[in-house]
Design a protein with these regions (language model features):
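Hydrophobic h-region of N-terminal signal peptides that target proteins for export
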Residues: 10-18
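Active-site acidic/histidine proton-transfer and metal-coordination neighborhood
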Residues: 49, 58, 89-179, 265
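Conserved, mostly hydrophobic/aromatic
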Residues: 31, 51, 59, 75, ...
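Hydrophobic faces of well-ordered beta-strands that scaffold small-molecule active sites
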Residues: 27-32, 59-61, 82-87, 111-113, ...
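N-terminal pre-domain/capping segments
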Residues: 2, 18-110, 278-281
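Acidic-and-aromatic substrate-binding clefts and catalytic sites of carbohydrate-active enzymes
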Residues: 37-42, 58-70, 88-95, 118-122, ...
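Acidic/histidine-rich catalytic cores of soluble enzymes
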Residues: 143-237
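Sec-dependent signal peptide recognition
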Residues: 2-8
Length: 281
């Protein structure tokens, strides 16, 4: 009798605890199109079908070589919103109006740049030029109803004065015109702490790339890595729950799973399952 009572009480307690658990990841499921770069280069339509089947409703990327209006319709037919448009640095500097037109035709709210041209090590001269260009381009894009985000890529962690060149870029760009996308892999690879940077710069961060770094990987501030260093979320060095909690606190609403390995189809599925398994407790 007592044994049965204890069993019932334990089951009841477990049920209550399960009901009190809430999912940690509650944002729309997003994908960085570069993850399926091979598929998009061969068959964009089938690749969008795959993205739909996987459950993604948001995407960051471009028009995959098609007309913007045509690609937007293909995405919409599959319930996919292209939230962020990726543009090259030179393209942004030379033709910001053209970039804005393309982004708006695709329905994007953000324009993202992921690389500042530089030779050898990234330096203060590169950073100063980027600040000047970002402030100018960011204002143009804002006037057209878009948010410009610079995607830090790890090479910005060269020391400068009392911080790094990333600190210099963030502190010298106008918050009205320039925001940032955190790629947690590259932040860690370059020597930064994603959680600390989220806390330090708060709502300057508007977007996030979700990816994980292989345990024991050799890191540096080159901004360059090898495909084997990309692993499914939750299997690498990064504290994904802590990062997501801090990102939610500062108001990041759009997250894009990205995988630069040669096993993206397998890794993406594992990463989705991992995100769904996380709870607030």
């Amino acid at each position: 009798m007592h044994g049965r009572l204890i069993t019932v009480l334990l089951l009841t307690a477990s049920s209550i605890l399960a009901q009190n658990k809430k999912p940690l990841y509650t944002a729309p499921l997003g994908i960085e199109a570069y993850t399926f770069r091979v598929g998009f280069s061969k068959d964009p339509v089938s690749t969008l079908d795959t993205i739909q089947v996987l459950g993604f409703t948001e995407m960051e990327g471009n028009s995959a070589g098609r007309g913007a209006d045509s690609f937007r319709l293909l995405c919409q037919a599959r319930g996919i919103n292209l939230i962020s448009y990726g543009a090259g640095y030179e393209q942004l500097v030379k033709s910001p109006d053209s970039v804005a037109a393309q982004a708006k035709a695709l329905g994007a709210k953000f324009v993202m740049c992921a690389w500042i041209p530089h030779s050898s090590l990234f330096n203060i001269d590169n950073a100063k030029k980027a600040v000047e260009d970002f402030n100018r381009v960011g204002k143009i894009l804002k006037d057209k109803g878009l948010v410009f985000c610079y995607h830090a890529h790890g090479y910005e962690f060269q020391s400068y004065e009392n911080g790094t060149l990333l600190d210099y870029i963030i502190n010298n760009t106008n918050p009205k015109w320039v925001s940032f996308e955190m790629d947690i892999f590259w932040i860690r690879f370059g020597g930064g702490d994603p959680v600390a940077l989220l806390r330090l710069y708060g709502n300057r961060w508007k977007l996030m790339h979700l990816k994980d770094l292989r345990k024991g990987a050799k890191t540096n501030a080159s901004g360059l890595s090898t495909p084997d260093n990309d692993v499914p979320l939750g299997t690498g060095e990064l504290d994904i729950p802590a990062i997501l909690k801090e990102a939610k606190k500062i108001g990041i609403k759009h997250y894009f799973i990205e995988d630069e390995s040669n096993q993206e189809s397998i890794h993406v599925r594992q990463s989705i399952q991992y995100l769904k398994s996380l709870s607030t407790e």
